[in-house]
Amino acid sequence: MARQYSRTNPLGFTPWPVTIITALVYLALVIPLLVVQHVVPSAPGSDPAGLNLTEAWADLQVLTNGFHPYNSHRNDDVHKWLLQRVHEIIDSAPARSTDSAHPPAVFVFDDDQSNLTFSGRGNELGVYFESTNILVYIRGTEDDETQWWADPQGQPASKGGVLVNAHYDSVSTGYGATDDGMGVVSCLQLLRYFTTPGHAPRRGLVVLLNNGEEDFLNGARVYSQHPLSRLPHTFVNLEGAGAGGRASLFRSSDTEVTRPYARAPHPFGSVLSANGFEAGLISSQTDYVVLEGDLGLRGLDIAFIEPRARYHTDQDDARHTSVDSLWHMLSAAVATTEGLVDDASDQFDGAPREDGKVASGSGSKAVWFDLFGSTLAVFELHTLFALSVTLLIVAPLVLLATSIALVRADRMYLFRSTARVPGSDDFDEGVSLQGVRGFFRFPFLLVIPTGVAVGLAYLVTKINPYIIHSSEYAVWSMMISAWVFLAWFVSRVADFARPSAFHRVYVLTWMFVAEWVLLVIATVYENRYGLAGGYFVFFALSGTFLATWISYLELFALPRKSEYARQIAPPSRYASNHGSRLGTSSGEHGMDDAEDEEDDDGDDEDEARNVEEEPTESTSLLRGRGQRTTFANYVRVTGDYLHGAGDDEPRETHVYGREQAWSAGLPKWTWVLQFLLSAPIVLILVGPLALLLTAALRQTAQDGSSPLFVYIAIAVLTTLLVTPLLPFIHRYTHHIPLFLLLVFTGTLIYNLVAFPFSPSNRLKLFFLQEVDLDTGVNRAFLSGAHPFVYEVARSLPSAAGQNVSCDLSAARPKCSWYGIPPQVQATATPDTADWVSFNITRSADQPTRARFSVAGQNTRACRLVFDDPVRSFAVLDSAYDPRFPHLSPQGTQEIRLWSREWGHTWTVDVEWTVPAVDGESRGVSGRVVCLWSDGNAPGVIPALDEVRRYSPVWTAVSKLSDGLVEGSRRFEV
């Protein structure tokens, strides 16, 4: 009896085991990744020592019971409340504990003296800002016990301390629960924790509650002028760019400062997010860039990242977050800060710097990523570079050496079409091995599905670009289902037409080459630009290399080619009157590929008669019977060729389907090991990156970013995630692919026709009202995605009957109409010109200089906007710092003025360079603008109230500029 290919082996390389095992592995990894992404670890049932979660949540509710931007009276109330809470926490610390440990000394600073002038974006923006920061210094056990900060030139004698920073201002349209209320209450709990006996820090700890972050990171910049800024060398910045979920490690300076974060109970994040910030994929910034870039500290940026639709809106409130999210940030902050303040080494202390920045030493570039939200892998980029170079050299050499060994062992079937029969003459064509079959499949398997996925990205961008805003998993399902189905279909067509036992090894070889090239690119970027986001390529190539090597080692189980050729009967021909046959059955025939494709000259009657006959084991295999017609006029040959010419010898059938007979010797279970080496590592590392990118970018199109980039990124990530299936997908049964075809059909239709926004995933519209105080004319502006912004604007009652004009040229279109006049003054002021007062005095001896005195009623934020840039400016009584240049070679076109006092008068000296006309120097012109940002009371900004009341439930309102209302007056000098 003939030996049958085992179809009951649960690990055999047959359809059902392959389908079930690969599907289960993918599900077993994808489901936990989704859980980690969307389920926040529960807060502990009882408060950990030194912390009080109930108190922290109550503080968050108080902090977020109103909008509190810097330019609002509610902001002053928050400032007073925070000072009160700081003193309450300090006073509540026990005098001593049972182990006789004393609480550390604590000093509180209400900074109402510091100010600073600096330049802003594009260097054509100047900013003057006055501090209302709150600083708390917890003296470390090894700190200098003198009050060195009392001396204007005093310097701490101890090692560098640690700064924990959060900002307590919100935007004018958001309550600031995650941006940055959770950071603020976490700072309060850190204050409680480190003033609890037994938790005293070794290094000094500075807790900074800064004010003015939302208006260009002003609070962090002016912090640089406080004496305490000379103490910290490292920092932890707590931020929020979403509205709940897990707090992610956004960025870090180096390996050494990142390692303490690994102590967090639930670390979360990837170094790729830092690379994304560097590439400008996310437009907003945090205080990290000031602390790390301008001041020279080394630290981390821990922030909430999703959903961005709630960011800077009225849904950034306590109701839309949770105690669990608060605990996730707080636990990470405690673990990281404790690791930094207890560090006894000198790794964060360096030599004094000539540029005036903090002497924090230098660290090594870091690679870091979490594993299932429970462990953080962190190591030096240099280590990754060394490992990458080693793998790039060693892996090809190992495969080359194995190939040479196979050649010497006469078992190198790869890339071999024939084998010579020992002792044959030179004219003998040899025995066909069909070892080249399957080599060219991979480009088609990769390019066709990827091309279709990219095409889908363009299609969705063209038809319904914002669908990912609310339906990201519908987009992912569409991409993955299309990719897998097409890959399966192409592989099945190829396997049907030209069966090959080498499909797996050839696809793995192609994957190895492709990933080797990717690793070369990633390694170059690591070395030249310090970008570590390609770390996953190293691990992917490592797994693919081992899987490929196993396939090469499997070939040692095959018979020697010479022995195999000796056993094979002389070559014969098969033909079909239906067309050429590209793929044959088992390779014992000795037929080469050209002979496979010859036509059959037999008549139809003989063929029909042969098909009707019942074949037996003794039936001749050279009679043309057993053929069956397939699509595309190909004929599948079912007979096996025997050793010798006799018909009574048993045939070798220990092969799969119509694959080559010599493959009977290949191991049947090693595919499982290969799959486990190549696929899980990709899912574990690339899967979180895909979810992180989706969460961070899926709702950025409303901010003016290109949605096409996100769809293309998903298409590319789909390819990375599913490519490990390609070596095995030709063995899949039809059940999953056909199901995925249905999924693709449904999700494609949905993604093209569904409305992209919902009450839980709202479209942000950005509001601003401008008032010409000279004429009293005002216009309300809404900016947002087209055409939705126009539809909302024209539906408002005040816009009825008006010609709503829209500027569609910008990345984020802006529509305007004559709005309802604002009532931003505390008392009725009929003449709008009185809202802003200014005086300009031109210098008599210097005709290109003038002094501006500017003030606004019921505001502490104004601007000077010039028609042409001025050469220089200086604000009276301002501090200047060489670390923050305030002048630009291109000049300054706008000067922003912020004060801690209401109705403050700023004095600004301006100098300009304008060519003389008729011997007389020309002056300058522009506008004096003041801002009003307090939208807490109804009726103060009726146009904003109207937008909130009458806009659809799927829209949200955010600020377009620093102010909600901007009133301006014209000037000429």
UniProtKB/Swiss-Prot annotation:
Keywords: Glycoprotein, Hydrolase, Membrane, Metal-binding, Metalloprotease, Protease, Transmembrane, Transmembrane helix, Vacuole, Zinc. Zn(2+) 1 binds at residues 167, 179, 239. Its EC number is 3.4.-.-. Residues 593-607 have a biased composition (Acidic residues). This is Vacuolar membrane protease. Residues 1-15, 405-438, 491-504, 551-674, 730-735 are cytoplasmic. Glycans are attached at residues 52, 115, 803, 839. InterPro entries: Fxna-like_M28_dom, M28_fam, Peptidase_M28, PFF1_C, PFF1_TM. It is found in: Vacuole membrane. Residues 572-623 are annotated as: Disordered. GO terms for cellular component: vacuolar membrane. The active site is at 213 (proton acceptor). Residues 37-383, 460-469, 526-529, 696-708, 757-973 are vacuolar. May be involved in vacuolar sorting and osmoregulation. Signal peptide: none annotated. Residues 574-587 have a biased composition (Polar residues). Binds 2 Zn(2+) ions per subunit. Zn(2+) 2 binds at residues 179, 214, 312. One of its GO terms (biological process) is proteolysis. Its cofactor is Zn(2+). The record marks 311 as: Transition state stabilizer. The chain crosses the membrane at residues 16-36, 384-404, 439-459, 470-490, 505-525, 530-550, 675-695, 709-729, 736-756. Belongs to the peptidase M28 family.
